[in-house]
């Protein structure tokens, strides 16, 4: 099966596992996905992720609040293969007035909207997470 949008597939797998209160989710591995997951972990949206040596799949540990409430309320893919969305540093949108995070692919790697604005770099707006 050929996957046309692997990032959307990863976000959908996370969203579905999150809605069903699963603790872990498996996604096919790639360098871009590992960068995105590193940002999600740093921002506190996921607990952890790791890539076993013998496997080609990333294991993502999802994060929940003490009362089993989901930490990730929503995920939305913005830039798609059929319609790419680019923004300059000044045009990068705030998600829910700063309560969410926009993932931006820049020349400095995958950054959050706040980091991209601070670094004064624009790029492709990959997704919104809140």
From Swiss-Prot:
GO terms assigned for molecular function: rRNA binding; structural constituent of ribosome
Transmembrane domains' residue ranges: none
Keywords recorded for this protein, A-Z: Ribonucleoprotein, Ribosomal protein, RNA-binding, rRNA-binding
GO biological processes: translation
SUPFAM superfamilies: Ribosomal protein S8
Keyword RNA-binding: yes
Pfam families per record: Ribosomal_S8
InterPro entries: Ribosomal_uS8 (IPR000630), Ribosomal_uS8_CS (IPR047863), Ribosomal_uS8_sf (IPR035987)
Any Gene Ontology CC annotation: ribosome
Keyword RNA-binding carried by entry: yes
Summary of the function given for this chain in its UniProt record: One of the primary rRNA binding proteins, it binds directly to 16S rRNA central domain where it helps coordinate assembly of the platform of the 30S subunit.
Record text on subunit structure and interactions: Part of the 30S ribosomal subunit. Contacts proteins S5 and S12.
Family under the similarity heading: Belongs to the universal ribosomal protein uS8 family.
NCBIfam families with a match to the protein in the record: PRK00136.1
Protein name: Small ribosomal subunit protein uS8
Designated gene of the protein: rpsH
